[in-house]
Design a protein with these regions (language model features):
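Function-determining surface determinants
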Residues: 1-472
């Protein structure tokens, strides 16, 4: 994690510095700075090899980065680096774009490090431009920052900046181009729809890079969420989009979502059953033997997903999704209209579908009915989230309530899925210990599924109250 700052003058003094480093880096990118446009990076540092930088969606001044260090000489990037960066590069060739000289001094504030950087752009070994920064960094979540921020401001830090070093040194051509687009109440339909689709397309690409890196299972989850949100946005905005264009994109996103879901669903089930087994004291070895089949299914599903994501056809799909997000096929008669006038009724339609489905449920709703209610809640939440950049806190509060309802229904659905899987496992088990473990866990999941049939009513009641809907 990190937060960057501009400096007026840093006054913590040499004796306070606990670390001093001098080094040079060679940065690689495409001629149109495709990596920089995504806040990603590829650099070589003599003596330390190659570093790949992947970032998730920037939220405010901080962003979460994943670094992958690879061995190799300076003449060309390792194949693994290009593989990890393929969602950004989409087969474009990379070359050297900048040589930088770094002078870094660091001071520790508890678990955090404040790094003062003086970075120079070198042309034929001569410094032609300079940038000065302080980065507040942590190896884990960026917490406990208040004392460090106070000390930094006292030392001369003046304000935050989200402009990366390469953009500051090389100019706007190296600036990020896939960040959030600001909207307000006066934004047009074209601006709002484009911003929503770009947001989801960008989240998909960023998280596909995390999927390829492989160490964080959250990458698959977030890529799937981005895929679903993109697809849901196309459905929500369908009345203002060309029908054939929308249908084709939704079909392609549906296929990708299936591949992502095959991995994510097995990961969720594994995590859930292991946690239930630990909570009930089920013997660990028996649990792992029970779950070995599921582990194998996850490995197979991930292998299939990776082969899809690395394919040339998928690279072409990403290009189409990004192009479609940047230039959606809007109906000419609606594109210039005020977004709030047009999109609010579309969100209202999604809400009415959810409300009708909820009101149709009797006192003993079935699992399938609750699953359909969860899907409706999810679609409504995505529609409301599209209004947050336009209307602010009102839709955000409703989206949070919808999220609570969705999570409650999601837990009930996960319990049903887990129970069904365990029931099959009991039927095929020949080992008594495995059968016993499966039976115990089946009982746990059926209890949770039964409880979930009533648990959703409380968040639904909170959501259905008129309070909080004044922005409509």
């Amino acid at each position: 994690m990190g937060i960057a700052f501009r400096l007026r003058q840093l006054r913590w003094g040499r004796t306070a510095a606990t670390r001093v480093e001098r080094f040079e880096t060679i940065h690689w990118d495409t001629p149109d700075f495709r990596l920089a446009s995504w806040d990603a990076g590829l650099r070589y540092r003599r003596g330390r090899g190659w570093r790949v930088t992947l970032t998730d969606w920037p939220e405010g001044p901080g962003c979460r980065r994943t670094y992958v260090d690879l061995e190799g000489g300076p003449s060309s990037p390792p194949a693994e680096a290009l593989r990890l960066l393929s969602p950004y590069l989409r087969y474009a060739e990379v070359g050297q774009v900048a040589r930088l000289r770094h002078l870094e001094t660091g001071r520790q504030f508890g678990e955090l490090w404040a790094i003062h950087q003086v970075v120079s752009l070198l042309v034929e070994r001569h410094a032609v431009a300079h940038a000065r920064r302080v980065s507040l960094r942590s190896h884990g979540p960026l917490t406990g920052t208040r004392p460090a921020l106070a000390a930094l401001r006292k030392a001369g830090v003046v304000d935050t900046t989200e402009l990366p070093l390469l953009a500051e040194l090389l100019g706007p051509e190296a600036a990020p181009r896939w960040r959030g687009t600001p909207l307000d109440r006066d934004s047009s339909v074209a601006q709002a729809v484009t911003a929503a689709l770009r947001d989801n397309a960008a989240r998909l690409v960023r998280n596909e890079a995390i999927v390829l890196e492989g160490s964080d299972p959250e990458g698959v989850h977030q890529a799937r969420v981005a895929c679903r949100r993109y697809r849901s946005a196309l459905q929500t905005f369908a009345p203002v989009l060309e029908p054939a264009w929308t249908a084709e994109l939704r079909d392609e996103l549906g296929t990708l979502g299936t591949d992502l879901g095959a991995v994510r669903d097995t990961e969720v089930l594994l995590t859930r059953l292991r946690a239930s087994a630990a909570a009930r004291g089920v013997e660990g070895e028996a649990t792992e033997r029970l779950l070995s089949r599921l582990v194998g299914e996850r490995v197979l599903a991930r292998d299939v997903l990776i082969s899809v994501v690395e394919s040339h056809e998928h690279g072409e799909l990403l290009q189409r999704l990004l192009a479609a997000a940047s230039h959606p096929a809007l109906l000419p008669e609606t594109a210039g209209q005020p977004a709030s006038d047009v999109l609010l009724p579309l969100m209202g339609a999604s809400w009415r579908k959810l409300a009708r489905r909820a009101h149709r449920l009797d006192d003993h709703p079935g699992d399938v009915d609750l699953h359909q209610l969860r899907i409706a809640a999810k679609k409504c939440r995505y529609a409301v989230l599209a209004l947050v950049p336009l209307l602010g806190d009102g839709p955000a509060r409703i989206a949070a309530r919808l999220g609570t309802l969705q999570d409650t229904l999601g837990d009930q659905h996960d319990a049903v899925v887990a129970g069904n899987w365990l029931q099959e496992a009991v039927g095929r088990a020949t080992d008594p210990e495995i059968a016993f473990a499966a039976g115990v866990l089946y009982g746990v999941e059926r209890e949770r599924a039964d409880a979930g049939r009533e648990a959703w009513r409380e968040p639904w009641a909170a959501l259905a109250r008129k309070k909080g809907w004044g922005w409509m």
